[in-house]
Amino acid sequence: QSIADDGVLYNRFHTTALCSPTRVALLTGRNHHSAGIGSVAEVATGAPGNDSVRPNTVATVAEMLRLNGYSTGCVGKAHQTPAWEVSMSGPFDRWPTGEGFEKFYGFVGGETNQWSPTLMLNTSPIEPPKTAEEGYHFSEDITDKAISWMRGLDVMTPDKPFFLYVSYGATHAPHHVSQEWIDKYKGKFDKGWDAVRDETLANMKAKGLVPENTELTGRPEGVEAWDDLDDTQKTVYARLMEAYAGMAEHTDAQVARLTDALKDMGKYDDTLFIYIAGDNGASAEGGLDGTFNELMALNGIPQVLEDILPRLDEIGGPTSFNHYPVGWAHAMNTPFQYTKQVASHYGGTSNAVAMSWPNGMEARGGVRQQWHHVIDIVPTILEAAGLPEPYLVNGAAQKPI
């Protein structure tokens, strides 16, 4: 919210309904099919536009900026690398360090354990600096690394511009966060997803984010009314959502650390800060019941809610790999229909964006209602940097942005 207060909020911003396609569109400014990633990298086919191989004719904004004198860094999740290239052997052309980022610290893939991630430093696997028992969390770790990198640049090359891509594993499953963050939402979802949808729509109308005559879409097939659920369902479902909400707020706290660091360095007012709330709509991948272990849901392994009840306090912790049920995904995509993976409906593609640049934008606290897409980010960055759209990058003629 503070970023929006310092700039503008975009409430009709859209992604591709999936992770990898959104990320390649974000980083290149081109349609995801023209960039070769029509779906998540792991399910690539040999079909044109869906082989997960970004061609050299589609350069990333990181490479464009690097070639124009910017320091470039990436921390967090990178999910636009072909699955067969994700190994210690490479090739590394489509890893972050091969796509214009001079530094990379994070993981390559769709998701990872937030307490014990599969970490990479550039192209080499490394162990986390400490364990979950010692207080480790991936979001905090990459925020530490991002701040350290920015401070190092500020000391060594204070006048050199930089481009930093911070891509949290949150709030993708598993929804891992410490108990103190989960406890902040204890009981807040006992009212159920139907009541939350009603409240969310009312708040959106009050803030002018949707027209006054906006109506809610119906529940997806198979999702029951909250009042029709039994006590076991309500207890488990509410707890899974508490963990998600705690993780979301914890992530916002890490973003606040980034802006605070920029302010401390005296660079915040001159920094174009773009906050994108996700690469797709809320996910239905937890199934109708949600799950204590998302890998069970993804592999079609049945679970019994009664088996989760004794482990409620473990949800969000190192022994879990949790994901909320579909009903909560529908609620979080209010007022739209459907969820992540469904590109035909705004429930899959609608993601809010906040953008600030105090010394570069006159607007403060406004809302932009125009229809925007993730491919609009790169031309915005180039215009802000005073750079033209490149026609050649490293000798390769570029597809138009």
Placement of each model-derived feature along the sequence:
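Formylglycine-dependent sulfatase
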Residues: Q1-I401
